[in-house]
């Protein structure tokens, strides 16, 4: 799912 995974990665990067 392009977007959902990216969103998760972005959130993890923020943390």
Swiss-Prot record:
One of its GO terms (molecular function) is serine-type endopeptidase activity. GO terms for cellular component: extracellular space. It comes from the Eukaryota. Keywords: Disulfide bond, Fibrinogenolytic toxin, Hemostasis impairing toxin, Hydrolase, Protease, Secreted, Serine protease, Toxin. It is found in: Secreted. One of its GO terms (biological process) is proteolysis. Expressed by the venom gland. Monomer. This is Alpha-fibrinogenase A2. It comes from Crotalus atrox (Western diamondback rattlesnake).
């Amino acid at each position: 799912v392009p977007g959902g995974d990216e969103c998760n990665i972005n959130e993890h990067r923020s943390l």
